[in-house]
């Protein structure tokens, strides 16, 4: 089975439309903000204190999309090397699905008092390999292409929280 759907629809955004990103209260006490519990579980604070914040590392985040990463303030200091859309070549990875945005925030956010990720000083490639409109085996090929692209641009680490075992057609499940 190979599935090919309609191309993604780009919905134009007005540059001045920031109403969806209202200021939120900063949590008190910790420079890690909302990420404090998460980074404590990984002993990340000790790593940061020892100077390990991702500097010199190239990380590829392979996911379903990175909606509004280019507009969210916790990513203002993001060291973005580039983006690549395997599903819709040439299209922006910053529209559509936001799962990759959430994953990236755990890694790259750098807004002390609000949220600091585990590797805020790393350099990042954002790669879209998931077509979130449906689930078909072709997405495994997209994922493989994303891994090959990440390797070709010299990344050190890949973060991918995608998995495939259940599809829209039951006969394709494993």
Question: How would you describe each model-predicted region?
Answer:
Residues 148-174:
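Short acidic, glycine-rich surface-loop motifs adjacent to enzyme active sites
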Residues 142-147:
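Short, acidic/polar
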Residues 3-5, 130, 161:
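Conserved residues at the C-terminal ends of beta-strands
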Residues 35, 45-140, 153-156, 167-169:
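Subtilisin-like serine protease catalytic core
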Residues 1-38, 48:
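Autoinhibitory propeptides
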Residues 1-2, 107, 150:
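Hydrophobic C-terminal alpha-helix "anchor/cap" residues
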């Amino acid at each position: 089975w190979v599935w090919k759907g309609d191309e993604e629809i780009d919905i134009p955004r007005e540059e001045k439309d920031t109403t969806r990103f209202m200021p939120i209260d900063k949590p008190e006490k910790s420079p890690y903000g909302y990420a404090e519990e998460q980074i404590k579980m990984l002993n990340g604070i000790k790593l940061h204190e020892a100077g390990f914040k991702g500097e010199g590392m190239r990380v590829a985040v392979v996911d379903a999309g990175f909606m509004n990463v280019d507009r969210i303030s916790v990513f203002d200091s993001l060291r973005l090397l580039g983006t690549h859309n395997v599903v819709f070549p040439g299209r922006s990875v910053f529209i559509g699905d936001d799962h990759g945005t959430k994953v990236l925030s755990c890694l790259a956010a750098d807004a002390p008092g609000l949220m600091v990720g585990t590797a805020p000083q790393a350099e990042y490639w954002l790669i879209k390999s998931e077509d979130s409109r449906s689930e078909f085996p072709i997405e495994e090929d997209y994922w493989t292409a994303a891994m090959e692209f990440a390797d070709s641009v010299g990344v050190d680490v890949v973060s991918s929280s995608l998995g495939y075992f259940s599809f829209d057609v039951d006969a394709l499940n494993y």
